[in-house]
Amino acid sequence: MNKFSKHFLSVLMSFAIYSGLAQTHKLEKLWETDTIVRVPESVLPDFKKGILYVSEIDGNPNAVDGKGGVAKITVDGKIIDLDFTTGLNAPKGLGRFGNELYAADLSEVAVIDINTGKIKSKIAVDSAKALNDITVDAKGIVYVSDSKTKKIHRIENGKVSTFLTNVAGVNGLKAVGDELFILGGQKFMKADSRGNLTQIAMLSCGGDGLEPVGNGDFLITCWAGHIFYVTADGKIETLLDTQEKKVNTADLAYDNIKHILYVPTFWGNKVMAYKLITTK
């Protein structure tokens, strides 16, 4: 066998191996709640207790009206308490550190006792207009996005500072290790501890929520009704498109052990669960 034939055979075998390893993904619907969850925007899980915390806007997403709150449901969709926390305005993103639950509430971050649902305190974010998503890193540092001012704020020991500015369309955040993964408009990016940005992928719509799969890949939602699987190197696979049905897909949660997505439907007034199925 000459050198050319050997090289060609090697390339052919490599392609066959790669093709065999290539994976595709799909979603299988598991359940949905009744349409009684009042404009759910974000889901935060406590898998040890089998609980999902759900932010409820309950009305105008920009109104300072005191109607918003946090609900509790089980991981199989049963309602525990629609009024676990009350007295918020238009809460969106949720985060947790220890026994404290954090809720992005327009111009403030509400700190909630996760055992009682009572609001312990509120952290004012100066100049904030539309606080949206929240994530908390392993050290307890809180990051919160402001979609109107294009800023990402950092809260450490109750003190607020600005981490990033001019992030157009900023919404979803997720702290993973020393990196902060960010959805800004159609861009999926990550920032290092100094705020240096690296673009990972360009979506077809404005990103809302994001959750790591556990292998470097991410699940990403667009509010209008799209769920994507995005690989670590930026390849995008569409898992769900409910835009024509006018079923929103807001800030999701993901169980990377059972491979289940929990998706709030905003104006749909319910939470839906899907199984992520991986095939080769």
Residues covered by each model-derived region:
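Short loop/turn segments that connect beta-strands within beta-propeller blades
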Residues: I73-G77, D113-K118, I155-K159, A191-N196, ...
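Blade-level signature of beta-propeller repeat domains, shared across WD40, Kelch, NHL, RCC1
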Residues: D251-K280
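A short beta-strand motif characteristic of beta-propeller blades
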Residues: L27-D34, K78-T85, K118-A124, K159-T165, ...
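Short glycine/acidic-enriched loop and turn motifs that connect beta-strands
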Residues: D58-N62, E108, T149-K150, K187-M189, ...
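Beta-propeller domains
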Residues: V54-D76
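Bacterial Sec-dependent N-terminal signal peptides
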Residues: M1-L27
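Asp-box/WD-like beta-propeller blade repeats and closely related beta-sheet repeat scaffolds
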Residues: L27, E108-K139, V144-S145
